[in-house]
Amino acid sequence: MTTEQTISANVQFFTISDDEAGQRLDNFLLAKLKGVPKSLIYRIVRKGEVRVNKGRVKPDYKLQHNDIVRIPLVRVTPKNEAPISTKLNKVAELEQHILYEDDVMLVLNKPSGIGVHGGSGLSFGVIEALRALRPQARFLELVHRIDRDTSGILLVAKKRSALRALHEQLREKVVQKDYLALVRGQWQAHINVIKAPLLKNELQSGERIVKVSEQGKPSETRFSIEERYPNATLIKASPITGRTHQIRVHTQYAGHPIACDDRYGDQAFDAKLKQAGLNRLFLHAHSIRFEHPKTAEQMFITAPLDHHLKTILAKLRAEK
């Protein structure tokens, strides 16, 4: 079911369907008010211009079935719309990176260098780009996130029910995600699992940094060796928990940082690979296994390495 919409004067009223129940008010508004800056959305909620069942609510309010949401008609100047529209030529190719799609979800092979959502100095991300490229889509939400510089598999829900079902699978840890990473040196075969708690810190510059700390959250990653090279190893990393920068910090903790990691990497190792042509973090979300949220079918999807990373591996093989 979809939201029922009524427009009266300069106000819109939306009746929340069962499919949309459970989501936060701010996320609902972001989907309905496409192109409206997030700061403006929070402002109209704070000022009470947005109401639920005639009452004021906070942005994190969880919408219920049959709630009536009052939203003022918001007019955005072309200036405010520019960040997404000026980037559309760059992100239009995202359609070519869709690995799987049906009526409730899609799976994307996200290119490196594109954030999954706007923010942190980025005016757009994958989800904003998909919404702009598909204005007819009633619902598009990220199921999970991967870092901007990481490429590979990203799940996007096209229905609220699919989002809820996939989130439940993530909470129950029944989703299996495998990454490929090129790391410094010869990875030791006996290092097949790292359990090291991770703590997030924010530097004065505002940059987020993660470190291993007893005060951190429990974190676990499993590892296996895919291919060895003279001074590097291609490994498979399977995160059991989903902490920020988990694979990047766990490989650093093991003494084998990922190639071209500008936060946790090794400059000398990176310099050699840059001479070979590597210009991005060598971390790729390679495969995912999960239960289809609608049919319960077991899904296994792989995302191939891009041409750039394949070329780097070919050069390393030639050095053997």
UniProtKB/Swiss-Prot annotation:
BP GO annotations: enzyme-directed rRNA pseudouridine synthesis
Record InterPro entries: PsdUridine_synth_cat_dom_sf (IPR020103), PsdUridine_synth_RluA-like_CS (IPR006224), PsdUridine_synth_RluC/D (IPR006225), PsdUridine_synth_RsuA/RluA (IPR006145), RluA_PseudoU_synthase (IPR050188), S4_RNA-bd (IPR002942), S4_RNA-bd_sf (IPR036986)
Regions annotated as coiled coil: none
Catalysis: reaction(s): uridine(955/2504/2580) in 23S rRNA = pseudouridine(955/2504/2580) in 23S rRNA
Domain S4 RNA-binding: 23-95
Pfam family, one: PseudoU_synth_2
Gene3D superfamilies listed in its UniProt record: Pseudouridine synthase, RNA-binding S4 domain
Entry-linked SUPFAM superfamilies: Alpha-L RNA-binding motif, Pseudouridine synthase
Residues annotated as the enzyme's active site: D147
Claim: Isomerase is one of the keywords in the record: yes
Family, per entry: Belongs to the pseudouridine synthase RluA family.
Stored PANTHER family: MITOCHONDRIAL RNA PSEUDOURIDINE SYNTHASE, RIBOSOMAL LARGE SUBUNIT PSEUDOURIDINE SYNTHASE C
Protein name: Ribosomal large subunit pseudouridine synthase C
Species for this entry: Haemophilus ducreyi (strain 35000HP / ATCC 700724)
